[in-house]
Amino acid sequence: MMRPVVVKEKQLNESQIHAVEDEVRQAKTMDRDIVTHAMKQSVAKLNPKVMIKNPIMFVVEIGFIITFILSFLPSSSSSIPGWFNITVSLILLFTVLFANFAEALAEGRGKAQADSLKQSKKDVFANVVKENGDIVQVSATDLRKGDVVIVKQGEMIPSDGEVIKGLASVDESAITGESAPVIKEAGGDFCSVTGGTMVVSDEITIVITSNPGESFIDKMISLVEGAARQKTPNEIALNTVLTSLTLIFLIVVVTLPIFTNYLGFQIDTAVLVALLVCLIPTTIGGLLSAIGIAGMDRVTKFNVLAMSGKAVEAAGDINTIILDKTGTITFGNRMAHTLLPVGNETIEQVGKWAAISSVLDETPEGRSVIEYVQGKSISYNRELAEQGEFVPFKAETRMSGVDLQDGTKVRKGAVGAVIEWVESQGGTIPKDVNQKADLISKEGGTPLVVAVDNRIYGLIYLKDTVKPGMRDRFEQLRQMGIKTVMCTGDNPLTAATIAKEAGVDEFVAECKPEDKIAVIKAEQDKGKLVAMTGDGTNDAPALAQADVGLAMNSGTTAAKEAANMIDLDSNPTKIIEVVGIGKQLLMTRGALTTFSIANDIAKYFAIIPAMFTLAIPQMEALNIMKLTSPLSAILSALIFNAVIIPLLIPLAMKGIAYKPMSSNALLSRNLLIYGLGGVIVPFIGIKVIDMIVGLFI
């Protein structure tokens, strides 16, 4: 009997292996296509109109043109052989090509993602409901904001919209990559639907919320393709500094012949161009765009859609994170943990009335009460409750329950609300109600009072569980210098207990949507950058106010439009990872800038002695690397300058590994690795290249 099971398991494993192999082959093919496209684009980007957007590499391209032209003209210096100019020009050409390749490779990954998204945009038809009630079939491209559309099982949702009638399971795997369908229903925070997703059960009526070209997928395609990419403030500032350095060195090199003529010797133009290229920060200049694009790409791969690079950078500078308790810090499913009778009541009486109040309650809390009572074998009359009239929970009453046919009113709800309700009917309150409610709150639970007419029977202890690992994650944020603030509608005692268990720095209890804005503004007034998550329409003002607002894809259209990031997986805890990606982007840019400027030191020791040794023999003392000859020294410095760019492309694309630590510790670590390393590596690299070049000169 065991043999068929073994064979079946083996076949399943083989099919899984084949599936993995197919995925690997497809990934390799896609990578080859991206590289091939990037190589073509690196040549196309040689267009001066494109190159001028990167002033540093534009100067290198001008140097290539000058030395290329000089290679066909008679040499003005007897010490410079004819092949030198063409060699320098070719090295400069490859320097520019390598920089273009880095940028094109980063853009190519975005294009591949965009192509994948475009596949989800199929030519579908929509069943539009006219004002007179007639249903007309039109193309999805003809839909306009405000149109009402009926989508049935098996049909594609034609455009972004909000459910106004019905409930259905929707397959959003084309957008989120998550195979499990999600429930979409009219009203509430889960009414938003995305064009290109599939209704897999039931039927819904939606109102279209976007015009053609403005849908969520259209925005995603535009962003990942880079069409809407703008340089971030930090990127512009760094680019300005690097351009200023380039301009200063350009002035130095242009005026240098005046001084050398005064000293009685001349420097060949190709040597001056080589000096300029070695002086300016070409390494970071060639990788700067790729770093920014790759940072956006990493966020997208994490299934987060950033509306701009500025949002990703801001995430890296965040000082405070505002987090909802429910669903972010805790699982959000408050379950019945125990029953506490009050006065002279028994647990059986509490369980009986708690169950009757919950029979028609479809909330997770209501279901958990029924499960708990049944698990304790407490008897109750289910038919009695089913024949009654259900009273749903409302924010105004903070209670739910059932009105039985005989006029009996059964309620469960917030302590204060139920006590007030009982007192309004002339009832008396047992002395131990508040005492036991406080005990539940101190333990991090939520107390619900169970009452029948003017009599309180006891309390239901609802407990929400903190997600595992949250304390460690908050400790990591604390090491980064980031403060965490938990916002919750719970009472202060419950909030304090959860905050202590989770390890957050501060909490705001009995928090309303407008309170979140106040918290954000208070932090911003202190000069801090604030991040928060949200999914409801009531979160939209706070998401718009925050420096980084992460909206859930399952949330409302208002929330997604107010935020500058959207999490396609609808996982609020992902804000912590987004902050890490932002810091990684900033750290990668800073580390490679440090490395680029530091490795110029070695190039100075290579090229400056080579320029002046013939005229000023004493300059030979600066040739500490003992390079073969002046010409090999210049060529070696230029070759290293070019080769280091493609060698650093993987690091620029992947990003430097980020470990939570203080800013001072991080600065010291990076200065040691990329500052000192940026000095040592070129000395070794140039010396090795010189030994090889010396064999041919």
Curated annotation (Swiss-Prot):
Belongs to the cation transport ATPase (P-type) (TC 3.A.3) family. Type IA subfamily. It comes from Bacillus cereus (strain B4264). Pfam families: E1-E2_ATPase, Hydrolase. NCBIfam families: ATPase_P-type (TIGR01494), kdpB (TIGR01497). The chain crosses the membrane at residues 55-75, 79-99, 245-265, 271-291, 605-625, 633-653, 677-697. Keywords: ATP-binding, Cell membrane, Ion transport, Magnesium, Membrane, Metal-binding, Nucleotide-binding, Phosphoprotein, Potassium, Potassium transport, Translocase, Transmembrane, Transmembrane helix, Transport. Its EC number is 7.2.2.6. ATP binds at residues 361, 365, 393-400, 412. This is Potassium-transporting ATPase ATP-binding subunit.
